[in-house]
């Protein structure tokens, strides 16, 4: 297990979430593919998912501003139909914390903490853990 995989696994265990992903800005046709992830047993992987255009997602537009996004109930977060299609494509994504990793003000990676199935009230400790993991991963990139 790589140091990045270990960091994601620890975040999964600390928060009790369903899935943690790392997306990186890599060359190629698909923006920000999932390069690493930690999953609860039975949770669907996003490593091969390529149907969602992340560049058109409202969450990514906020991440470009350097903001951590916290959504307790994703269904109420945005009206954008593309966002709602993403929720289904991602296995019934119900709640998430999405944290940008910026280098020289450029979005280079994204750490996402996902809760599938039902909305979830994220606590301050969940947000802090996601931010700390993002800092840890940034140092490894």
Where are these regions (language model features)?
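A short, aliphatic-rich beta-strand micro-motif
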Residues: 94-102
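The cytosolic transmitter module of two-component sensor histidine kinases
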Residues: 1-4, 56, 123-126
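Signal-transducing coupling segments at domain and membrane junctions
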Residues: 72-95
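Short coil/loop residues immediately preceding or within conserved phosphate-binding loops
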Residues: 17, 58, 81, 96, ...
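Sensory-domain boundary capping and coupling elements
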Residues: 101-115, 140
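Regulatory loop-to-helix N-cap segments in sensory/regulatory domains
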Residues: 115-133, 140-141
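Amphipathic alpha-helical coiled-coil segments that mediate homodimerization
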Residues: 1-22, 133
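GAF sensory/regulatory domain recognition
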Residues: 9, 21-61
């Amino acid at each position: 297990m790589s140091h990045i995989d270990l960091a994601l696994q620890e975040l999964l265990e600390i928060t009790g979430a369903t899935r943690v992903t790392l997306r990186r800005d890599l060359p190629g046709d698909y923006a920000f593919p999932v390069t690493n992830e930690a999953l609860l047993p039975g949770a669907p992987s996003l490593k091969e998912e390529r149907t969602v255009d992340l560049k058109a997602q409202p969450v990514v537009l906020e991440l470009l501003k350097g903001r951590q996004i916290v959504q307790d109930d994703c269904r109420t977060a945005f009206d954008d139909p593309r966002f709602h299609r993403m929720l289904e494509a991602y296995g019934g994504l119900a709640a998430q914390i999405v944290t940008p990793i910026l280098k020289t003000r450029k979005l280079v990676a994204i750490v996402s903490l996902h809760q599938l199935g039902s909305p979830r009230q994220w606590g301050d400790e969940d947000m802090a853990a996601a931010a700390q993991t993002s800092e840890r991963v940034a140092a490894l990139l």
